[in-house]
Curated annotation (Swiss-Prot):
Effect of loss of the gene: Significantly reduced survival in human serum, probably due to complement-mediated killing.
InterPro entries given in the database record: Bac_surfAg_D15, BamA/TamA_POTRA, D15-like, POTRA, TamA_POTRA_Dom_1
POTRA domain segment(s): 187-263
Similarity field: Belongs to the TamA family.
GO CC annotation terms, alphabetical: cell outer membrane; TAM protein secretion complex
Protein purpose: Component of the translocation and assembly module (TAM), which facilitates the insertion and assembly of specific beta-barrel proteins into the outer membrane.
Residues annotated as signal peptide: 1-21
Organism: Salmonella typhimurium (strain SL1344)
The name this protein goes by in its record: Translocation and assembly module subunit TamA
Subcellular location, principal: membrane
BP GO terms, sorted: protein secretion
Quaternary structure, from the entry: Interacts with TamB to form the translocation and assembly module (TAM).
Transmembrane segments: 265-276, 279-288, 297-306, 309-317, 327-336, 347-356, 361-370, 387-395, 406-415, 428-437, 444-453, 500-508, 514-523, 536-545, 549-557, 568-577
Length: 577
């Protein structure tokens, strides 16, 4: 019986405490700005059902408020508690009335730097961030300053650094605070030799990927860049490059060890897709990310749709002196086209030399050979071409698969001459630009411009793949794919020697990953610029930022065209740049 009575009393006390807690609300008055924000952060650990009017809880709140104020230089606040009766159908309110009091001011910030830090510009720059004498103490500034010293040491290779002394002195009677820091960075480490384990690629190729030389001063960004460059080659499944500290304490020369594992030798990918331009499409590819110890790689692919069937390959050969940014590319393939008034069988082979520059620009010179049998309208021809060319391009983006900012630029010149065996003389100049900009997160603008010019004395021998046609998803919407060009006397498309198209599209973020779009496209594909024939299409669309890239659905109509009146729709998936 006594035990039962005790249990009953305990149960009643718990129920009573819970009932009181559920009927009391805590309120803090007298603070604003950063003081209020910091105190609220200290009190955030208190749950609403923990609030009670008893002395123990008040002491807990008192401690939390003092800690929050102390961090910002207020060491002597006055805190008074009042318990207000509940309003009608409300709860009791426990009010903490706070007077912050006189703040503690910075009286001095003595920082002594030893070792390499005495002359290192990054450490010296930190000294300028110390608070001015007479400003209110903020303990966060002191803690962050110490963290910054440590951060510079780790970033720049002062791995023996230590605080000989670090003290924040408070003289409450004078309401002053004093920094007293004595920091020895020690000697800066330098990069030593780099060794690799597990690589199937020759060591000299890997050594030429290093963004630093042996003996250079250590920088953590250089180590991160080496990891990035090794991954960017596509040769490895995993890459880890780490310092070997145990071998460097005496000499301050830091060797690095890279542990890599080869990527799978063969990768096969298949896919089924649909685009309005070519309809349903089946794709397959076979990739060999490395074929030998020189890092050569091979990609073959095929794409089959009703109007186009393509089989091609690409063989990449990195150069020893700069394997990531400089390489040869051998490309070739076969393409069969039966679209509108074009029938073509084309076999191509090209050898290109690439330079990928640190600025983001890519440069290339190439030598192409092609053999084409084609019928364009009523004209049938067979041509063999052998022509060099140059190309420069750059793509930049920020914001993931559906960029908030970005641009893509590509400029090329190709030249063919019968003097070296081509069947036709020509010069081809092309420029393609895409720009993406976003304002205030919800307003997205996509602008496109394409220009092309063919100069030749025998246009009928130029293969359709080199001629210009407009119309379609990435050209002038409202018109069918490649349906705009000059026509012959029978009304068949001939292709054009001049191209100019542009597009302006505005997208608005309706909700989440969904965007609405309105656009206008305009341009022409002509052979005589004196006979301008601009076409314009306009429409609306929907965009979904899917995990694999933007999915689009557009509806467009021609504007002011007496021959074209129908509604065209476009479905697509893929990058906009």
């Amino acid at each position: 019986m006594p035990h039962i009575r005790q249990l009953c009393w305990v149960s009643l006390l718990c129920l009573s405490s819970s009932a009181v807690a559920a009927n009391v609300r805590l309120k803090v008055e007298g603070l604003s700005g950063e003081l209020e924000k910091n105190v609220r952060a200290q009190l955030s650990t208190i749950q609403s059902d923990e609030v009670t009017p008893d002395r123990r809880f008040r002491a807990r709140v008192d401690d939390a408020i003092r800690e929050g104020l102390k961090a910002l230089g207020y060491y002597e606040p006055t805190i008074k508690f009042d318990l207000l009766p509940p309003p009608a159908k409300g709860r009791q309110v426990l009010i903490a009335r706070v007077t912050p009091g006189q703040p503690v001011l910075i009286g001095g910030t003595e920082v002594i730097l030893r070792g390499g830090a005495r002359t290192d510009k990054d450490y010296l720059a930190l000294l300028k961030t110390r608070p001015a004498i007479g400003t209110v103490l903020n303990q966060g500034d002191y803690d962050n300053f110490k963290k910054s010293l440590t951060s510079v040491s780790l970033r720049k290779g002062y791995f023996d650094s230590e605080f000989i002394k670090s003290q924040l002195g408070i003289a409450l009677g004078r309401h002053q605070a004093f920094w007293d820091i004595d920091y020895d960075s020690g000697e800066r480490y330098r990069f030593g030799p780099v060794t690799f384990e597990g690589s199937q690629i020759r060591d000299e190729y890997l050594q030429n990927l290093l963004p630093f030389k042996e003996g250079d001063e250590y920088e953590s960004k250089d180590l991160a860049e080496l990891n990035r460059r090794l991954s960017a080659t596509g040769w490895f499944n995993s890459v880890v490059v780490a310092p070997e500290f145990e071998k460097s304490r005496k000499t301050k020369i830091l060797p690095l060890k890279g542990v890599v594992s080869p990527r799978t030798e063969n990768t096969i990918e298949t896919g089924v897709g649909y685009s309005t331009d070519v309809g349903p499409r089946v794709k397959a590819s076979w990739k060999k990310p490395w074929m030998n110890s020189y890092g050569h790689s091979l990609t073959t692919s095929t794409s089959i749709s009703a109007p186009e069937q393509v089989l091609d390959f690409s063989y990449k050969m990195p150069l020893l002196k700069n394997p990531l940014e400089q390489y040869y590319l051998v490309q070739g393939g076969f393409k069969r086209t039966d679209l509108n008034d074009t029938e073509q069988d084309s076999t191509t082979l090209a050898v290109s030399r690439y330079w990928d520059l640190s600025s983001g620009w890519q440069r290339a010179i190439n030598l192409r050979w092609s053999f084409d049998h084609f019928t364009q309208g009523n004209v049938t021809n067979t041509t063999m071409l052998f022509y060099p060319g140059v190309m420069i391009s750059r793509t930049r983006s920020r914001g993931g698969l559906m960029p908030t900012w970005g641009d893509s630029q590509r400029y090329s010149v190709d030249y063919s001459n019968t003097a070296w065996g081509s069947d036709v003389d020509f010069s081809v100049l092309q420029a393609q630009n895409v720009w993406i900009r976003t304002l205030y997160d919800r307003h997205r603008f996509v602008m496109r411009a394409n220009l092309g010019w063919i100069e030749t004395g025998d246009f009928d021998k130029v293969p359709p793949d080199l001629r210009f046609f407009a119309g379609g998803d990435r050209s002038i919407r409202g018109y069918k794919y490649k349906s705009i060009s000059p026509k012959d006397s029978d009304g068949n498309l001939k292709g054009a020697s001049k191209l100019a198209t542009g597009s302006l599209e505005y997208q608005y973020n309706v909700t989440g990953k969904w965007w609405g779009a309105v656009f206008v496209d305009s341009g022409e594909a002509v052979s005589d610029i004196r006979r301008s024939d601009f076409k314009t299409g306009t429409g609306v669309g929907v965009r979904w930022a899917s995990p694999v890239g933007p999915v689009k659905l557009d509806f467009a109509v021609p504007v002011g065209d007496k021959d074209e009146h129908g509604l065209q729709f476009y479905i697509g998936l893929g990058p906009e740049l």
